[in-house]
Amino acid sequence: MSAAALKVTTEARPSSRLAVTVTVPGERCKTSYEDAITSLSRSINLPGFRKGKVPRTVLVQQLGGVRIKATALEKLIDNAWRDAIQQESLEPISQPDLSSGFDGLLESFEPGKELTFTLEADVAPTPKLKTTKGLKAEFETVAYDASRVDAMIEDSRKQMATVVPVEGRAAQNGDIAVLGFKGTYTDDGSEIEGGSADSMDVDLENGRMIPGFIEGVIGMKVGETKTVDCQFPDDYPKEDARGRKASFEIELKDLKTRELPELDDEFAKQASEQETLADLRKDLEQRLKDDAERRQTSNRRDALVAALVEQLEVELPEALIQQESRNLLEQTAAQFAQQGMDVKSLFTPDLVRNLMQNSRPEAEERLRRSFALTALAEAEDIKLDDKAVDAKIKEVKKELSADAKIDPERLRQAVMDDLIQDRLMGWLEENSTITEKAPAADDSKAEAKKKPAAKKAEAKSKSKADAKD
């Protein structure tokens, strides 16, 4: 079908949608109908007729005019859409939707008569920034915590400790208690689901169990049985247990403790690739300092981009939101797969729907950040030159092993993404006002509990000591 025969008008719609109204001449409608009859006659099997030799009148009688018209209309719409976007140089990013609905259009479709219909599709948005200069951003500082070095070393000592039986004394903090216990709710006497064990190793450290449990075990002797009263915290994961009082019948069946290795150069050699304890400390200190600096830089950049996003004007198309949500879902699945989980059985249709829905806010935020930076590059004409890209690629290749398999195009794109990101952030740094603020007290406690700095440092450290944290 010739695209020149179409009449096409376009109209922008909210959420980066484009309405494309197409008027198809009667001749094309008739041709589509005749093509549908020919196609169906070749594919249908009717008793007494060879395939492709079914008379027209018999075919219409057997299939009905509606089915033939529907087949013709489907093909007509597909061809008209393809020709219209080519004729008008349109770039949709989603499949089109028929505004009036197929059934309504089918009623008005007559072979040989002109037909007008409107299709809507998502198109790439045009992001704009209200302003680019003079932005104000505030970010949280990240301080190097020297106490983490000692904590990491102590954790490594625990990993390398020898577990030995305890004799002649009661249980105390830091011991490993072998417990048998049974828990019931105080209010109705019902058993606590998952609140019983015949023999379970429990580290006697505060925070390991619900409040009151560890404290109740401290001071017990092997063979002793004791009733301990506890209370579930209000934020306990299991909803029906929150805030409820409980009673546990506890028997201390055995008691063990850890004999930690001496904190000396020999320990450093066994726990890491360092020769001395001093070298181990120095290595951990530097890695934690580097990590704190990286996280502070990340906080600074996040604050600048957040300030830029506030100036962004863009309507996100649904197609991009869905695609970004799928990207996040695939990342989650990949993480689970790396942990050895069976992703196919885990990701049920219901779970996928929930994850897609829950990831939508993050998907939208990521898109806004991306569009804000794209708009900044456009507004301020921030570009890359080939020499800088080539130089960076050579630098990256030097750090890779000789036998590493590299996709040149993917490497170049990754390098370009990093370089343009650096240039955009550098421009924002120079043209914005940035102030520091100390982390909130509660956030500091949460950070200390989660130990993200240590975990990141340990993951990159060559030492076994920090890798075991």
From Swiss-Prot:
Spans traversing the lipid bilayer: none
GO molecular function term, any single one: ribosome binding
Coiled coil (residue ranges): none
Cross-referenced Gene3D superfamilies: 3.10.50.40, Trigger factor ribosome-binding domain, Trigger factor, C-terminal domain
Keywords on record: Cell cycle, Cell division, Chaperone, Cytoplasm, Isomerase, Rotamase
One GO BP: chaperone-mediated protein folding
UniProt-listed Pfam families: FKBP_C (PF00254), Trigger_C (PF05698), Trigger_N (PF05697)
GO cellular component: cytoplasm
Known catalytic reactions: [protein]-peptidylproline (omega=180) = [protein]-peptidylproline (omega=0)
Annotated family: Belongs to the FKBP-type PPIase family. Tig subfamily.
Function: Involved in protein export. Acts as a chaperone by maintaining the newly synthesized protein in an open conformation. Functions as a peptidyl-prolyl cis-trans isomerase.
Comment on protein domains: Consists of 3 domains; the N-terminus binds the ribosome, the middle domain has PPIase activity, while the C-terminus has intrinsic chaperone activity on its own.
UniProt-listed NCBIfam families: tig (TIGR00115)
Name assigned to this protein: Trigger factor
Native source species: Synechococcus sp. (strain CC9605)
